[in-house]
Amino acid sequence: MKVFVAGPRAVSVLNKQVKGRLSNIINNNFTVLVGDANGVDKQVQKFLHSLNYRNVKVYATNGRARNNIGQWEVEKVEVEPSKKGFDYYAAKDIEMAKNADYGFMIWNGQSRGTLNNIINLAKLNKKVLVYFIPDKQFYTIKDVNNIKMMINTDNTPVSAKFHEFMHNSEQLKLF
């Protein structure tokens, strides 16, 4: 089983609950697909490396990994030179979503990239375990309706971001 693990660059600490779920992945010897960004990607890499876990693939745009703490295999994701910014780095997320069997996302309710990963995995009919930082809860996402339930209409800023994103996402149009 291959698990795509990701989250925002703004999150620089993994709590006990998240580390516990990562430990479950390790105990099952699942392959971890992780990006090379700072934030959650880097913290996940540090945690996996601290446990000498080797069943990891780091996805990097054009093969240039910004972070590869465990010197794991790098999956090179070719990106057209015309792509810039969000779209440039998001290309590797799309590949991880396609290649994964399951997703594990740590989301702060603000990261556009993490929300996009959750949506893309759901649209690919892949389950996603989301640790939703605002609620300090785990949610299992099977489809877009589950995302709506997770963000709850009471959380107006998060809900507004979700609805805006669903209507304006360039990355979603790549499928």
Question: Could you describe each region identified by the protein language model?
Answer:
Residues 154-175:
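A charged, well-structured terminal subsegment
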